[in-house]
Amino acid sequence: MVYFVSMMMIGLILGLMGVASNPSPYYAALGLVTAAGVGCGLLVSYGGSFMSLILFLIYLGGMLVVFAYTAALAAEPYPEAWGDWSVLMYVGIYLTGLVIAGKYFLVGKWGDSWAGVEELSSFEVVRGDFGGVALLYSLGGWMLVLSGWVLLVTLFVVLEVTRGLSWGTLRAV
């Protein structure tokens, strides 16, 4: 199980690197799907099955719509691939920053425990995952409403930007 979780963590870093290097919107969308899938798989391996399902649906439902509009706006006949030198430079900068931040911030703090939600010392009647969902809807209800409004405003902004060549924001000058 440790090997499986380690491979999923490496996959999460590679997916986030694909989003951060962003050679083309097509590859950034692929990196986002990879990062969302592997990140939710990590949550499942630590015992958070319901929250991982909700996060996966939010990522794929909300963010990929924005990436679809971005890909439609920035349609390139010859997009940059991950093997180009400029993209490899961004990947190198991202990995260097990740290693430096990991050595500086994470020295001895979280590396000692791989315990999941169900491996805690206390005996609980309700799983930790469902307790978190209850807190999300009770104390975090205002954050859900705020997130819904932000997604709605984002949708209207994207629709306004892509409305038309003569009326929208992206018109030929």
From Swiss-Prot:
Its EC number is 7.1.1.2. Its main location: mitochondrion. Keywords: Electron transport, Membrane, Mitochondrion, NAD, Respiratory chain, Translocase, Transmembrane, Transmembrane helix, Transport, Ubiquinone. Gene3D superfamilies: NADH-ubiquinone/plastoquinone oxidoreductase chain 6, subunit NuoJ. It catalyses: a ubiquinone + NADH + 5 H(+)(in) = a ubiquinol + NAD(+) + 4 H(+)(out). GO terms for cellular component: mitochondrial membrane. It is a multi-pass membrane protein. It is found in: Mitochondrion membrane. InterPro entries: ComplexI_Subunit6, NADH_UbQ/plastoQ_OxRdtase_su6, Nuo/plastoQ_OxRdtase_6_NuoJ. One of its GO terms (molecular function) is NADH dehydrogenase (ubiquinone) activity. The chain crosses the membrane at residues 1-21, 28-48, 53-73, 87-107, 139-159. Core subunit of the mitochondrial membrane respiratory chain NADH dehydrogenase (Complex I) that is believed to belong to the minimal assembly required for catalysis. Complex I functions in the transfer of electrons from NADH to the respiratory chain. The immediate electron acceptor for the enzyme is believed to be ubiquinone. PANTHER family: NADH UBIQUINONE OXIDOREDUCTASE SUBUNIT ND6, NADH-UBIQUINONE OXIDOREDUCTASE CHAIN 6. Belongs to the complex I subunit 6 family. This is NADH-ubiquinone oxidoreductase chain 6.
